[in-house]
């Protein structure tokens, strides 16, 4: 943050300050349906309707002062404008779709299972290969890092880390456009979009030095940590901030003690709300869960396996589940967009 955190010096063909016009300003702030609640919810994420425009397709479903969780089903690439989020880092998980993340610091090809981390202030466009795209996005007002316990004091990932530097894909194919004209950048600031027209192409960088750049990491490259008995959720941790953590549940061996019960035990997250986004496979602890579903279990009340899930897990050797988890240290508010796709009876699904 500021002059103490990661930074990058970028070298441009032109001054990146040449604003010709500021056009529209409009709000994209999440509209809150339930600010204070204690109900567990299931959201049917694939019920979010596809929309042509990338920004218009982004539907905020859960939010607090630290982060916003967004579902998006864009059908078209961002052709007519560039985008810059000055409020938050963006972690974009690609559930469906392939294409190219084009940024001022180079391009990244993406596919199913990729996390794309775009630091705040990076100007970018999304190019999709087809119209069939599904994204799970976390906007973070706090910087997103790899977990500190995976790194030594030099910043090198240690041998017990479930991924290594080689798994993190840096931008390639630096585009340098030495062009003068009118270039529309949609800038997000304090939950408003400002349409700003610049006199020079925003992708006019000829090179850069530093540590602040976008990168990609595939959930399929996360090496699971397993044990003879049930392991706690931190073994799945992939990213962290000082306000929430992000975990990856991937195919792995179940607990292999002779008397182990693979299903998790009932537990209360007293200090955090738990959000699970179900990507693929059969999630062992849940009944009636499909790809694209989101479960929200608020802090303060217990949750655990659905009836029958514990019994079904006995004797199983492995799981093929794939899911992304976000645990926030502040309570999450439920938005109006979330209520459109919510199962209002989910909290009763543990009744036997």
Predicted regions, residues:
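Jelly-roll (double-stranded beta-helix
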Residues: 1-352
């Amino acid at each position: 943050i500021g002059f103490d955190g990661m930074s990058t010096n970028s070298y441009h063909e032109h001054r990146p300050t040449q604003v010709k016009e500021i056009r529209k300003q409009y709000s994209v702030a999440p509209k809150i349906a339930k600010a204070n609640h204690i109900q567990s919810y299931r959201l049917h994420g694939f019920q979010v309707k596809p929309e042509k425009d990338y920004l218009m397709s982004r539907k905020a479903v859960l939010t607090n002062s630290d982060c916003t969780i967004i579902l998006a089903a864009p059908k078209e690439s961002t052709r007519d404008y560039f985008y810059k989020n000055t409020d938050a880092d963006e972690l974009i998980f690609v559930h469906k779709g392939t294409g190219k993340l084009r940024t001022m610091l180079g391009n990244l090809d993406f596919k199913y299972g990729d996390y794309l981390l775009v630091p705040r202030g990076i100007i970018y466009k999304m190019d999709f290969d087809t119209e069939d795209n599904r994204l799970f996005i976390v906007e973070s007002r706090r910087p997103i890092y790899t977990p500190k316990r995976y790194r030594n004091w030099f910043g090198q990932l240690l041998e017990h880390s479930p991924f290594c530097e080689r798994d993190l894909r840096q931008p390639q194919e630096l585009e340098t456009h030495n062009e003068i004209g009118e270039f529309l950048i949609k800038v997000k600031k304090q939950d408003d979009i400002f349409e700003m027209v610049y006199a020079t192409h925003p992708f006019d960088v000829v090179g850069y030095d530093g540590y602040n750049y976008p990168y990609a990491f595939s959930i399929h490259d996360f090496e699971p940590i397993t044990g003879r008995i049930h392991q706690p959720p931190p073994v799945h941790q992939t990213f962290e901030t000082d306000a929430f953590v992000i975990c990856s549940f991937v195919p792995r061996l179940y607990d292999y003690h002779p008397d182990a019960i693979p299903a998790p035990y009932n537990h209360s997250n007293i200090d955090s709300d738990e959000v699970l986004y179900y990507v693929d496979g059969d999630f062992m602890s849940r009944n009636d869960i499909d790809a694209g579903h989101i479960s929200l279990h608020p802090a303060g009340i217990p949750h655990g396996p659905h009836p029958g899930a514990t019994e079904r897990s006995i004797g199983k050797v492995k799981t093929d589940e794939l899911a992304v988890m976000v645990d926030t240290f502040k309570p999450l508010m439920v938005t109006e967009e979330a209520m459109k796709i919510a199962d209002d009876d989910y909290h009763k699904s543990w009744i036997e």
